[in-house]
A protein has these predicted regions:
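Nucleotide-activated donor-dependent transferases that construct or modify glycoconjugates
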Residues: 1-12, 39-40, 61-63, 254-258
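Conserved N-terminal ligand/cofactor-binding loop architecture of enzyme catalytic domains
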Residues: 7, 35-136
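A short, glycine/small-residue-rich beta-strand->loop->alpha-helix junction that serves as a flexible
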Residues: 8-20, 150, 262-265, 436
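Conserved catalytic-core segment of nucleotide-activated headgroup transferases in glycan assembly
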Residues: 18-24, 225-322
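Short N-terminal targeting/anchoring amphipathic segment
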Residues: 94, 137-156, 340-346
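Active-site-proximal region of nucleotide-activated glycan assembly enzymes
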Residues: 123-127, 131, 151, 163-238
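Donor nucleotide-activated moiety binding/catalytic core segment of transferases
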Residues: 135, 140, 294, 298-350, ...
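Catalytic binding pocket for nucleotide-activated donors in carbohydrate/polymer assembly enzymes
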Residues: 190-192, 212-214, 349-430
Length: 454
């Protein structure tokens, strides 16, 4: 009997992986048990949804406790070595803009060094020195997995399990959680035996940034978007608008803020849009405000406006950070994107999902009523590596003022087919073919590996 150990870092991994064909395909492996390792959470609900006696086992080891100072130090060391513009923007936000110039220059030095092979080799030596939580080690020794599958390669538990497996000469398969992971979160401190990436850009990033062997990379697409290819993905229009308490006969703007941490002037922009719905600038128009599941936004204070409906997606457990997305939530998002006339956001991956449904999408490149320099402005977000290919297609225009925003909204409402081809290119650049099979392709990487294990 072979064993595949899969740590489940958070609810996003559950949504993006377990609720796709990934697990269903993986369960077809003969003489193989699959262990889903929860850090914390409701074991009973996971067993009810995913468990299969003697086949899919749910384990909860309580190993996701707050990292100690040593772990935080190691984590920061690797994180700041990600050699990208994305990381530079973060370092400016975290340090330079707060007057912490010493920390900025120190972290920038790590980022510059991160491009060099000799530095990456040094980091792997450093990585081997990080203490491993005894609970993680106990889980590994309990199951002695033949394969460790790391769905994000970011969490400290995943990194520890990858280390233990490599030391034990077992197979490690890593996966880039989303199309921005390799440039923002997942410094490849450990080279897995196989690396799953969503697109060809991910291949270029793994090879170019981290000198990862190209022949060990597998391109699968993005599993969490598989549901968008299913026939029952979209709710009927009348049913959807009844659910969100909006008028199906009006034009609908979906406003999707990423949270005040990313754009603290969203409330100013949304406030102006609501004013436009009251006069002849945007007649017969309503707004659906879709808050981020985990981040606060001052836009919520506009709740109560007659042309606004507010929702926060997902099921939350005590606070915003602990939440779950089930298939109904995913289908609701798909229906929201499909039935909206225009989507507005700030540098969010939601722009890609809008393009999948060929819904006109506008992204904000100005800061409400405030004039800010580049390094303080939301305009900087569009220099991040994962968004550059999307913006370059021309399918997602950047509004640089209130006037441009109003003109774009009016233009798209009047002519929704405008930039259809460009939106197709944007979706393909990130997702490849949306055929509903990305989860199965990711699982097949594991199945092929299991076949090679004696």
């Amino acid at each position: 009997m072979k064993t595949v150990l899969i740590p489940i870092h958070d609810g996003t991994v559950t949504k993006n992986l377990l609720r796709t064909d990934f697990l269903a395909t993986l369960k077809t492996a003969p003489n193989t048990k699959i262990v889903l390792l929860l850090g914390s959470g409701d074991v009973a609900s996971y067993e009810a949804e995913f468990g299969v006696p003697e086949k899919v086992i749910v384990e909860c080891a309580q190993v996701y406790n707050r990292a100690d100072k040593v772990e935080l130090l190691f984590s920061s060391f690797f994180k700041h070595s990600i050699p990208t513009m994305f990381m530079k923007i973060r370092q400016v936000d975290w340090y330079w803009n707060k007057g912490k110039y010493g920390l900025y220059f120190g972290s920038s030095l790590l980022r510059v060094c991160g491009r060099f092979r000799i530095w990456q080799q040094f980091l792997r030596i450093v990585n081997a020195l990080e203490p491993i939580d005894p609970k993680v080690r106990a889980v590994y020794e309990k199951w002695h997995p033949d394969v460790v599958f790391a769905p994000t390669m970011v969490s400290r538990v995943e990194v520890a399990l990858m280390r233990l497996a490599q030391k034990d000469k077992k197979v490690v398969i890593g996966m880039a959680k989303s199309f921005d992971n390799l440039t923002s979160k997942a410094y490849l401190r450990i080279h897995p035996d196989y690396l799953i990436v969503p697109n060809q850009t991910g291949t270029q990033e793994a090879v170019g940034l981290y000198h990862y062997p190209k022949e060990q990379i597998r391109v699968t697409g993005i599993p969490q978007y598989d549901v968008y290819a299913t026939a029952d993905c979209i709710e009927e229009r009348i049913q959807f608008f009844e659910k969100v308490n909006l008028d199906p006969n009006k034009k609908t703007i979906l406003y999707a803020p990423a949270g005040d941490w990313m754009n603290d002037t969203d409330h100013e922009v949304l406030g102006e849009i609501l004013k436009w719905t009251e006069d002849d600038k945007l007649p017969n128009t309503q707004v659906l405000l879709r808050l981020h599941p985990t981040y606060e936004s001052k836009t919520e204070k506009l709740k109560g406006h007659p042309n606004l409906y507010v929702e926060r997606p997902g099921t939350h457990f005590g606070n915003l950070k602990r939440y779950q997305f089930d298939l109904n939530d995913v289908r609701h998002l798909a229906s929201t994107l499909y039935h909206s006339d225009v989507v507005i956001n700030t540098g969010s991956t939601l722009m890609v999902e809008s393009c999948i449904f060929d819904t006109p999408v506008i992204t904000l490149g100005f800061d409400g009523y405030t004039k800010r320099g580049y390094w303080q402005s939301v305009a900087r977000y569009y220099s991040r590596e994962h968004l550059v290919p999307v913006i370059n297609t021309g399918g997602v225009p950047i509004a640089k003022s209130f006037e441009e925003l109003q003109n774009l909204i009016t233009t798209y409402i009047a002519n929704p087919e405008l930039h259809t081809e460009e939106r197709k290119k944007a979706a393909f650049a990130v997702c490849g073919e949306i055929d509903g099979k990305a989860g199965a392709r990711a699982a097949n990487v594991v199945l092929q590996t299991l076949q090679q294990i004696k």
